Amino acid sequence: DLARREADIAVRGIPKHKRPPKDIVGIKLGRISLGYYVHKELLSEASRSQRELTCIRASGRALSLGDLPDPESLGLKSRHLIDGITPRTVAVTNKLGVAALPCFLAKQYPDLMLLPGVPSAHWGYVWLLHHKDLRQSARIRALFKHLSALEEKWPNCWDTSLDNARRAA
């Protein structure tokens, strides 16, 4: 917790419509996109009517879907409520259902794929943050200067949304 001075810096994903708190200073490092991911075997079983595709949801407090459609509009029943990116990822990799996951995380699991017909969507940004009282710290300034210079080289895998693909073209 930066506000309580439990750390000098923090890396956070913040939705695109929000900003860091007033007493926290930061820079955007890159864009994050979300997508509905499913295990390839579960999708195959569902296409053969052997299993039903259901959605693993997060509570509204834990995850905003951003521009992704609601699971119900995709015909997915919500069967499980799991807060936390890591537990939801584990659930999807174990074929429990479909879940909205950050693309940079899901890409690390070759058995996961985007739900067909539902493109990923820009969700927010990765921010590097520090408390405003550390603005004069030489090591904080040096780190932020170095990382902001790398911004153009930041991984595109964090944002696989269509608008990012259009910008790159």
Label the predicted regions:
Residues 13, 89, 140-142:
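Hydrophobic alpha-helical segments, especially transmembrane helices
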Residues 135-149, 154:
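Short amphipathic alpha-helical coupling segments at ligand-binding clamshell hinges
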Residues 4, 16-126, 152-169:
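C-terminal regulatory
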Residues 129:
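Short hydrophobic/aromatic beta-strand micro-patches
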